[in-house]
A protein has these predicted regions:
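Oxidoreductase cofactor-interface core, primarily capturing Rossmann-like NAD(P)-dependent enzymes
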Residues: 1-37, 41, 51-63, 72-81, ...
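Conserved SAM-binding strand-loop segment of SAM-dependent methyltransferases
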Residues: 44-47
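A hydrophobic C-terminal alpha-helical subdomain
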Residues: 14, 18, 223-291
Length: 291
């Protein structure tokens, strides 16, 4: 039995879809009954919370391989550590941990939290696979599409730094392989980058071509970006963590590497940014055009 935690999240939903295609038995974990009701028909669901070990013990009973992912919140280390503890208690044989690019060498922001969980997992002696993905193509829709629709522009303190964005569906395909065939991926840590690296200005050009109108990237000072995010109601810890992560990309230049790791694992070419934008171009449609 395979356990998919975070099944209502962007990555978890994609992992569910991939594992479902395989025909392997699996269970999808949701934190609330409302989320569980959104599961695809026929999917075996269970309600549990990483903050409640008793609920986790019941949810993980009989599970052989588990995908662990938690929302990027300050309690991440504690919550995912609970998941590792329960996996040990109930006899889970293999864990696939969703970490982040930068966990190996960045002492700030989300990557540093993930590294603490990685270290605990490795020390536990559980068989495991760790995935460290770069930023997602889907984040362009989640974070940049609103200003693109309203102003034909998006803003960040990124300068000319390059990012090799990865499609969540490619990440999910790798995770599913590790869940379905754990022996082939045990003890491995995969840093997963997209197939091409682009600056935000180049990404704006690609969005422009996809939607058929000019879209600009506007490089702004970090403090201006901080103020904008705070004005939007984002909590200060989240703003600081996001800007620290952005510095990993923009100042340290750590987000633009392109490697063969992802295509080798997939056994095919990864989804390109052009392909992604062609599929999701309606998400960037101008409000003036009636979006």
């Amino acid at each position: 039995m395979i356990m998919i935690t975070g099944a209502s999240g962007t990555v978890g939903r994609a992992v569910l879809d991939e594992v479902r295609k395989s025909g392997k038995p699996f269970r999808a974990m949701y934190r609330s009954s409302n989320d569980g009701r959104k599961a695809p028909p026929g999917v075996s669901t269970v309600q549990a919370d990483f903050a409640d070990k008793n609920s986790l013990r019941q949810a993980f009973e009989g599970v052989g391989a588990a995908y662990l992912v938690c929302s990027p919140i300050p309690q991440l280390v504690e919550l995912e550590s609970n998941g590792i503890d329960v996996c040990l208690e109930v006899g889970v044989r293999h864990v696939v941990l969703n970490s982040a690019l930068g966990a190996a060498d960045y002492s700030k922001s989300f990557p540093s939290w993930h590294r603490k969980v990685e270290d605990k997992l490795k020390a536990s002696k559980l068989s495991c696979t760790i995935v460290r993905p770069n930023s997602f193509m889907q984040n362009l829709v989640a974070y940049n599409a609103p200003s693109i629709r309203a102003q034909n522009a998006f803003y960040a303190a990124m300068g000319n730094a390059k990012l090799s964005l990865i499609d969540v569906r490619d990440l999910a395909a790798v995770i599913a392989k590790a869940l379905i065939s754990p022996a082939e991926h045990a003890g491995k840590t995969y840093e997963l980058n997209g197939p091409e690296a682009f600056t935000y200005a180049q990404i704006a050009d690609k969005i422009s071509r996809a939607v058929g109108r000019p879209v600009r990237f506007v490089d702004i000072p970090e403090e201006a970006q901080r103020k904008t995010m705070l004005d939007m109601g984002m909590p200060e810890w989240q703003v600081t963590a996001l800007l620290d992560l952005q510095q990993y990309y923009s100042i340290l230049g750590k987000g633009g590497e392109v490697t063969q790791v992802l295509p080798d694992l997939l056994g095919r070419s990864p989804i390109t940014l052009d392909q992604f934008l062609a599929e999701f171009k309606d998400s960037f449609r101008s409000q003036a055009a009636g979006a």
